[in-house]
Amino acid sequence: MINISAAWIGFLLGGISGAVPGLFFHGQNWLGGYASWPRRLIRLGHISFFGIGFLNLGMGLTGLALDVTSAPASVLMLVGAATMPLVCYASAFRPLFRHLFFVPAGSVILATSLFLERMV
C-alpha cells in the first residue's frame, strides 16, 4: 500500500525538518522565542510529519493484515500528510494561512472515518 511508503517518507522528512531548525533552537529568542507563533508552528509542522506518518503506517499495515482497502481513505490520508506540514510552515510566516487547517484536518478525519467504515 502506498500509505506505508508515505509513512517512511514522512519519517525521513520529519527527521530533516527537525534537524534543520534544531541548529538554531539554542537561541532563546530565535523566531521570537519558544512560545512565539512562528516557532510553535514550525514545531507543529515537524511533528506532523511523524504523527500523520504513523497514521499512514497504521492504515497501510492494518489494511494488509485485515485485507481491507479503501482508495478514497488512502488518498485522503496522503492529502493530510502532504498538506498538514505545508499549512503549518506557511502559517508560521503568514498567519492568514491558518484558515487552511481545515484541509489537512478534514482529510485525516474523513480518511480515518472511511477506513473505519471499511473495517466494520
Model-derived features with residue positions:
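Polytopic transmembrane helical bundles with strong interfacial aromatic enrichment
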Residues: 1-43, 50-120
